[in-house]
Amino acid sequence: MTDAANPPADISALSFEEALSQLERIVQELESGQAALERSIDIYERGAALKAHCEKKLEAARLKVEKIVLGQGGAVAAEPAEFN
């Protein structure tokens, strides 16, 4: 079983878009019900690793986003954005 916290190297090298595309194809294959049991288990595990990778990429992007605020005296500063 693949540890979602430590995805395989081939997944770690994927961009968000590439990982999401692979994850979408896995979901389609699983939903079709046409895959054999062992294949279903294998691609489910890969899908879990891809999901974790996508979440990690999204979190990294979120942390990069900043909001511009006008401070006292008209000073402009950047602060981490809050998405609550």
UniProtKB/Swiss-Prot annotation:
- Please tell me which top-level EC class this enzyme sits in: hydrolase
- Localization per record: Cytoplasm
- Keyword Hydrolase among record annotations: yes
Any keyword Cytoplasm? yes
Q: Give the EC number(s) under which this enzyme is classified.
A: 3.1.11.6
Q: One GO CC term of this entry?
A: exodeoxyribonuclease VII complex
Q: Which reaction does it catalyse?
A: Exonucleolytic cleavage in either 5'- to 3'- or 3'- to 5'-direction to yield nucleoside 5'-phosphates
Any one of the GO BP annotations: DNA catabolic process
Any one GO molecular function term: exodeoxyribonuclease VII activity
- Disulfide bonds listed in the record: none
What's the stated role of this polypeptide? Bidirectionally degrades single-stranded DNA into large acid-insoluble oligonucleotides, which are then degraded further into small acid-soluble oligonucleotides.
PANTHER family from the xrefs? EXODEOXYRIBONUCLEASE 7 SMALL SUBUNIT
Q: How does it assemble?
A: Heterooligomer composed of large and small subunits.
Which family is it part of?
Answer: Belongs to the XseB family.
What is the protein name given in its UniProt record?
A: Exodeoxyribonuclease 7 small subunit
